[in-house]
Structure formats: C-alpha cells, structure tokens
Amino acid sequence: MPELPEVETVARSLAPQLQGRTITGLAKLDWPKMLTPSPDEFAALIAGRRIEAIGRRAKWLLLSLDGEWTLAIHLRMSGQLLVAEPETSEARHVHFALDLDNGRRLIFNDQRKFGRVHLLDRQGLAALDAVHGPEPLAADFTPSALAERLQNRRAPIKALLLDQHLIAGIGNIYANEALWLARIHPLTPGAMLTPEQINELHHAIRHVLQEAITNQGSSLRNYRDGYGRQGTQQEHFNVYDRAGEPCPRCQSTIERIVVAQRSTYFCPTCQITMQQPE
C-alpha cells in the first residue's frame, strides 16, 4: 500500500498537471462502490469545479476544489492516479476518470478495486482530518510530541507506528526501516522507550520518510507517480523484505516475525528486545 512518501510524490507530480484546471465532467465509473456520494450526485457536484490545489493528509490525496469542496482519494493497495489522454481510460483496470478542460483525463487505475474516491464538503474534510494523528514531517511533530503519543502505550512500538490515529502516514515499509535505523526492536512496548530512544526514533522516522520522498517512493508492485514513473526507494531498503540477508550495519542475519498481522523485519543483534513494563 502506498504510504506517506508515495502519496506525497503523487501529489507533487500531479500539481503542475492539475492546478488551475477545470473538471468538465465524470468520464468513467465502472466500480460505483469506490465512490462517495452516489454517482449521480457526484457527477452533478464535480462538473465545472476548478482544481485550486493538490495536497495530502496521511495516506489520502487531496484535490482542493472551488466552492469549498475537496476530492479525497485513497490509493489503497494497487491504485495509480495519472493524467493521460482520453483513450487511456479505456484500459481494463481504469475504473474512474474525470474529464479536464485541456482535453486530458485524470484516471484512477486500480487492479484490485480497493481504492476510494470521496467528494467532501468542509465538514467531511474536517472529519477525515480528525481521525488521523499528527503528520510526522510537520514542524510541530517534535520528540516531545512523539513521547506524548506513546505514553502509557503497552502495545509493540511497531503496531503503534502503524496506528493512523496516533501518527499519520507511516505504513509497514517505513515502520520497519525507521525502527532499524533507531536500533529499536519492533516488539518493544511503546511505554518502555527511553527519552534517548524516542529522540532516535523521531529522527529515524523523519529521515526515512524524507529519503523516500527524495527517491520518489518505493515501487514494489503497482505504485507509480502522476506521470507513470516508478520510485527507487526500494533500492535503499535496509531490512524491509530482506529476511535471511545480512544486516547492513552488523552483518547478522535479518529475521522476519509478524506484528499487528504485518510482516516485520529486524536485526536481532542491532535491535535490542525490551521487556514489558509491570
């Protein structure tokens, strides 16, 4: 699933293609379950709207429209959002497309049909914002803010990093990478982290996310940016999906376990196991 760096990359790549453009209509919808509100209401509301800005909240792509509406798009497992020629929307896995005033289309290619497209008013956008934790790259996401989010949390730190209510945008890839960089075992209870470990984790989270954005995200399967280009962050993984390989730091063998129903990769030598608090 695309995480914060991938969605940020898509937003940045779509901005020069979409900002200032007008949506002239709903060109294609063959999977109505992905859409909110109903197709007829959506089509009536979206036509003639000008795209004023493109941004991101957590793993949601946000297209700010005139009239205080926002088009919120979640790529889920296999979604790709591209600006392309109209004939491209006839491809088998394109389930949603919008006509633009320059003759091109914004298309949503989604092989697994898990993606979502929501047209939100101000109240709906506020509700989406409220269910997510702070943005880990924001200026106010300090080590103290991270410590506050983890206070009294006995769940494994890996599970806590995946909780979008606590911290927005981090998924399985970058949780693994951040914990390795910070030398923290993924099963360590959040409440057990020392101030020094929290500082290290804070730095690691921001570092791995920024590095991934610089490298245009991780293209493991379906992910592409708004121009259809692959990212290269997968070439820089230290532990993710590297079970059985040597740790880049100490040469011990990287291991795999399951935490919060997700594959979890770590170095048993570098990442020390902590005990559950009593």
UniProtKB/Swiss-Prot annotation:
Cofactor list: Zn(2+)
InterPro entries documented for this protein: DNA_glyclase/AP_lyase_DNA-bd, Formamido-pyr_DNA_Glyclase, FPG_cat, MutM-like_N-ter, Ribosomal_uS13-like_H2TH, Znf_DNA_glyclase/AP_lyase, Znf_FPG/IleRS
ZnF region ranges: FPG-type: 238-272
EC number(s) on file: 3.2.2.23, 4.2.99.18
SUPFAM superfamilies associated with the record: Glucocorticoid receptor-like (DNA-binding domain), N-terminal domain of MutM-like DNA repair proteins, S13-like H2TH domain
NCBIfam families documented for this protein: fpg, PRK01103.1
The family this protein is said to belong to: Belongs to the FPG family.
The protein's name in its UniProt record: Formamidopyrimidine-DNA glycosylase
Complex formation: Monomer.
Residues that coordinate or bind DNA: 93, 112, 153
Textual note on the cofactor: Binds 1 zinc ion per subunit.
One GO BP: base-excision repair
Family annotation (Pfam families): Fapy_DNA_glyco, H2TH, zf-FPG_IleRS
Catalytic activity: Hydrolysis of DNA containing ring-opened 7-methylguanine residues, releasing 2,6-diamino-4-hydroxy-5-(N-methyl)formamidopyrimidine; 2'-deoxyribonucleotide-(2'-deoxyribose 5'-phosphate)-2'-deoxyribonucleotide-DNA = a 3'-end 2'-deoxyribonucleotide-(2,3-dehydro-2,3-deoxyribose 5'-phosphate)-DNA + a 5'-end 5'-phospho-2'-deoxyribonucleoside-DNA + H(+)
Chain segments annotated as coiled-coil in the UniProt record: none
Protein task: Involved in base excision repair of DNA damaged by oxidation or by mutagenic agents. Acts as a DNA glycosylase that recognizes and removes damaged bases. Has a preference for oxidized purines, such as 7,8-dihydro-8-oxoguanine (8-oxoG). Has AP (apurinic/apyrimidinic) lyase activity and introduces nicks in the DNA strand. Cleaves the DNA backbone by beta-delta elimination to generate a single-strand break at the site of the removed base with both 3'- and 5'-phosphates.
Active site: 2-3, 59, 262
